[in-house]
Amino acid sequence: MAYNAQFDLNFLFWFLRPFALVDVLKKPRFLDALTVYRDRRDYPHKLCNAIEAYGLTDAVNSHRAVDDARATVQLLEAMAAERDDLAQYIDLFGTHPKYGISGRKISSVTYHPQPYQRTVPLYELL
């Protein structure tokens, strides 16, 4: 799980590529908290906005890996308490409706344009 998982997976892809280990990215399951948050709240969609929107006063958004990981866990806990549908988002990444994804696609992930207007959850658009 990560906030904007596609961004992190791009780093992993390019790190693993010289060692011919890219296939390890096919095995795990992925949960992108950004995709879930986009379905729950209006723009802006930065992690700091999500922390504020859910009133996570203990969460720290310092752009440091450990702080951001802890904040993402707290955010996912809050979103799970709000609506019990996080399992529907596993291996589903919302993409920018105009620009698509950045970087390499992960073969085990379903990518789908995620509209700005929140009418139905992304998983219902598939």
Where are these regions (language model features)?
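DEDD superfamily 3′-5′ metal-dependent exonuclease/proofreading module
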Residues: 2-126
